[in-house]
């Protein structure tokens, strides 16, 4: 007698959220199984990969990364080049220089860059800010207004500014909004409830539940992802059924394994290869934990994770 495995799909299902417009639009979420459990049920939408484009990308030092973007001068130039990257599904514009404690770039300049990128590319666009609550609130609102009709995702609304960001981004301008918390299922659920309380539709919310480079407290991330996914699928908790997007690259490329020079750590080997390894490991860990999309940076890392996803779905 042959063995016939019993499929075990869950009663709950992750919301399907569409980003972008036209032929390049993507859908994240939509599954009713744990990550890559395709033996239990089909995953209708494979996890997606976004490419980070920072307005401080000229300071990136990895040789192959600099070579890939050689000749790029503006954010729109970087975006057009990133759109050709093998494995890329969407673009993430990261406005690091807007930080008032750093370069303090003006909101108007950032909006101009976002508009130039939107005119130059056809892939879906995700927006990341500078982590300053007041500056991000203004920046997100202005970009959401300028890119009306593009169906962008803004990362992210937080407990401190969810009313401002949720109301302007999702309600006033019809964009998708991220809900950002720090490795805590209860905080993630509470923020989703508060956004829905503003009448933001569940299918307009994407969670950013926190991440970290592997080896740097990632066990907290892993347990949070596991608990959120099990609550959403097994318990049908509608307040946790939003898809998850994990910004991997800022963490992976900021740890010592990626930043220590070969002169300082000769036994560790090639510095760029270390950074790629950290990014690949962190992205894979997030995806197997439950992330529906990851944001990455290096072409070699993106290509590796694309192959990883293709072989598992």
What annotation goes with each model-predicted range?
Residues 160-308:
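Catalytic alpha/beta core domains of metabolic enzymes, predominantly
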Residues 105-119, 141-153, 307-313:
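Short, electropositive alpha-helical surface patch
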Residues 47-53, 89-93, 123-129, 150-157, ...:
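Hydrophobic faces of well-ordered beta-strands that scaffold small-molecule active sites
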Residues 1-69:
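N-terminal amphipathic alpha-helix/helix-capping segment at the start of soluble metabolic enzymes
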């Amino acid at each position: 007698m042959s063995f016939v495995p019993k499929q075990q799909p869950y009663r709950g299902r992750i919301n399907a959220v569409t980003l972008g417009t036209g032929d390049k639009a993507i859908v994240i979420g939509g599954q009713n199984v744990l990550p890559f459990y395709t033996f239990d049920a089909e995953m209708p939408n494979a996890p997606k990969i976004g490419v980070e484009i920072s307005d401080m990308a000229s300071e990136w030092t990895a040789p192959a990364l600099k070579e890939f973007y050689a000749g790029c001068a503006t954010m729109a130039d970087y975006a057009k080049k990133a759109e050709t990257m093998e494995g890329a599904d969407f673009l993430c514009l990261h406005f690091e220089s807007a930080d008032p404690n750093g370069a303090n770039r003006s909101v108007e300049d950032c909006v101009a860059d976002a508009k130039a990128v939107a005119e130059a590319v056809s892939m879906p666009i995700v927006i990341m800010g500078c982590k300053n609550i007041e500056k991000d609130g203004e920046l997100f609102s202005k970009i959401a207004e300028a890119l009306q009709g593009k169906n962008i995702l803004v990362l992210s609304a937080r407990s401190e500014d969810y009313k401002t960001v949720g109301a302007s981004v999702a309600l006033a301008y019809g964009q998708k909004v991220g809900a950002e918390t720090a490795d805590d299922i209860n905080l993630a659920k509470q923020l989703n409830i508060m956004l829905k309380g503003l009448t933001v539709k569940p299918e307009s919310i994407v969670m950013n539940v926190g991440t970290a480079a592997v080896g740097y407290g990632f066990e907290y991330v892993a347990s949070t992802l596991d608990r959120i996914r099990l609550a959403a699928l097994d318990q049908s908790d509608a307040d946790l059924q939003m898809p998850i997007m994990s910004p991997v690259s800022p963490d992976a490329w900021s740890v010592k394994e990626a930043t220590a020079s070969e002169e300082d750590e000769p036994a560790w080997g090639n510095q760029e290869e270390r950074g790629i390894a950290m990014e690949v490991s962190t992205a894979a860990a997030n995806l197997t934990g439950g992330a529906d999309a990851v944001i990455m940076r290096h072409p070699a890392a993106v290509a590796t994770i694309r192959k990883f996803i293709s072989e598992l779905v």
